């Protein structure tokens, strides 16, 4: 039984490596290095660069798989870069596709829970980003929890920069998720939307520039 599971996992990994045009030997070597040196369950292609691996925290039986998804419109030679100056917390199986860029500031934390991050997505965090269980992020999505440039005006209210994506959400391609956004469980954000607000109602379709709720009581399938 155990032998059959091992063979099945090797077969899945072999297919992933073939579709990503990378050597299974190189992938296995990196996996062993992460296990032996850092005690981390990380599986990556050779085109992945991770700084400060020690700052990645894993819950029990959790795995981080980076750069091994088959995405036809993304060059297999593109680099996936994770600059982890703060903390990254991984729960369940977290998949990060090719050409994703992650930058976590010293004071920040990114929490990824059994989710998928699509190719060419940027997660730039100076306050905190949390993506819930079962959520999927499409390609070229930008998460940005910091303004970088101060704009002052009368009656300006302070705003918590943290971004929270609930469970089982779908974020469409080319969406901008900005500082202070909260998206409730089961919501779908339509492609090319710009999300600036707080959406606490579950199972809504959110769309537009700026984004607003356009449908309620929706459902979607993986």
Swiss-Prot record:
Annotated protein name in UniProt: Uncharacterized 24.8 kDa protein in cps region
SUPFAM superfamilies (alphabetical): Trimeric LpxA-like enzymes
Matching Pfam families: Hexapep
Source organism of the structure: Klebsiella pneumoniae
Chain segments annotated as coiled-coil in the UniProt record: none
């Amino acid at each position: 039984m155990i032998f059959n599971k091992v063979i099945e996992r090797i077969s899945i990994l072999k297919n992933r490596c073939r579709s990503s045009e990378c050597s299974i030997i190189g992938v296995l070597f990196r996996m062993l290095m992460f296990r032996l040196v850092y005690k981390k369950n990380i599986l990556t292609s050779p085109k992945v660069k991770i700084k400060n691996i020690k700052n990645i925290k894993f819950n029990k039986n959790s795995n981080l798989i980076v750069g091994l998804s088959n995405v036809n419109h993304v060059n297999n030679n593109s680099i996936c870069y994770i600059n982890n100056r703060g903390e990254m917390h991984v729960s369940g199986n977290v998949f990060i596709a090719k050409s994703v860029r992650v930058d976590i500031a010293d004071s920040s934390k990114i929490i990824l829970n059994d989710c998928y991050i699509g190719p060419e997505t940027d997660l730039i965090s100076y306050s905190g980003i949390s993506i819930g269980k079962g959520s999927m992020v499409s390609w070229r999505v930008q998460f940005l929890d910091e303004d970088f440039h101060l704009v002052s005006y009368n009656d300006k209210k302070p705003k918590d920069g943290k971004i929270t994506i609930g469970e089982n959400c779908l974020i469409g391609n080319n969406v901008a998720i900005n500082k202070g956004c909260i998206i409730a469980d089961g919501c779908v954000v339509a492609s090319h939307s710009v999300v600036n607000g707080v959406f606490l109602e579950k199972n809504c379709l959110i769309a537009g520039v700026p984004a607003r709720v356009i449908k309620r009581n929706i459902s979607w399938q993986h």
